[in-house]
Each structure stands twice: as structure tokens, then as C-alpha cells.
A protein has these predicted regions:
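Helix-coil boundary and interhelical linker segments in multi-pass alpha-helical membrane proteins
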Residues: 16-27, 84-93
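Alpha-helical transmembrane segments of multi-pass membrane proteins
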Residues: 30-41, 74, 78-82, 100-108
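Hydrophobic alpha-helical transmembrane segments and immediately flanking/interface helices
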Residues: 87-115
Length: 143
């Protein structure tokens, strides 16, 4: 029973991974950053009561649900980029989409840290600028 369940999970996981073009460093980074962003958002609202997503700045289930829905749609857009790559015979649309979303998640994490009063190291600020420029240059190449 246990082996069958594990095998089923492996098959489903492998299928989903193949839909996204593989489980590479970019996709792993995006998923990790999405988790960090969601977690830091919970801390901002639950501990610091300083969220800009709710009227009183504290935890609200609807705001959390909206955040999870956004994360899900983000992954669907990555899936669309991957499938477009396959149809067009290219390999850069998915990467451009993932890099853009990594930059977006990084900005959100830094904003959440700022709402908690955490000082942001300049190297992180510079890395965000590099990610933004890379995403913009890939957008221009795709036009």
C-alpha cells in the first residue's frame, strides 16, 4: 500500500514537473521565493499588524486566500510560457517568465521585510536591480 502510494505521488510529481519544463534551479528558486513571500506576508499581518492587504493591517483569511490564488496563477503563467516555448521551438520564454516572477517575488519579500523594520542589505537591492534589468532585456529580445 505504502509503495503504491509513493509510486503514485512520484508519477503525478513527474508529470507536473514535465509540464513545467523540468525542475531546474530557476523553477526551484521561484517556488522557494513564493513560499518565503507568503510566509513573510503572514508575519507582517499576524505579528506586526502592518499589512497593506487588509484594512486593519492584521491577518484576514480572504487576503491569504487571494495570495495563494495569485501564486497559483503565477505558476500557470510559467506553464503557459513553457508550452509556448515548445510550440515555437524556443527555450527562452519560460526562463524570461520565471526570472520576471523571481524579481517580483524578491521585491515583495524585501517590501515585507521593510514593513517589519528589517534593514535591507545593499547587495540585495543591487541584485533586485540586476534581475529587473535582465527581465526587461529578455522582454525586449522577445518583441
Amino acid at each position: 500500500m505504502k509503495e503504491g502510494f509513493c509510486a503514485g505521488i512520484g508519477v503525478v510529481g513527474g508529470f507536473i514537473t514535465s509540464l513545467f519544463g523540468g525542475w531546474d534551479a530557476a523553477l526551484i528558486t521561484l517556488v522557494i521565493f513564493m513560499g518565503i513571500d507568503y510566509f513573510t506576508g503572514l508575519i507582517v499581518a499576524g505579528v506586526f499588524h502592518n499589512s497593506n492587504k487588509t484594512e486593519n493591517g492584521s491577518l484576514e483569511s480572504l487576503a491569504g486566500w487571494k495570495g495563494l490564488c495569485r501564486k497559483g496563477v503565477t505558476l500557470l503563467i510559467v506553464l503557459v510560457g513553457c508550452r509556448l516555448d515548445l510550440v515555437m521551438g524556443s527555450n527562452f520564454i519560460r526562463d524570461a517568465v520565471v526570472i520576471a516572477f523571481i524579481a517580483n517575488e524578491t521585491i515583495s519579500i524585501v517590501e515585507n521585510a521593510g514593513l517589519m523594520g528589517v534593514p535591507i542589505p545593499s547587495v540585495i537591492v543591487k541584485a533586485i536591480e540586476v534581475l529587473k534589468k535582465k527581465a526587461e532585456s529578455e522582454d525586449k529580445e522577445n518583441e
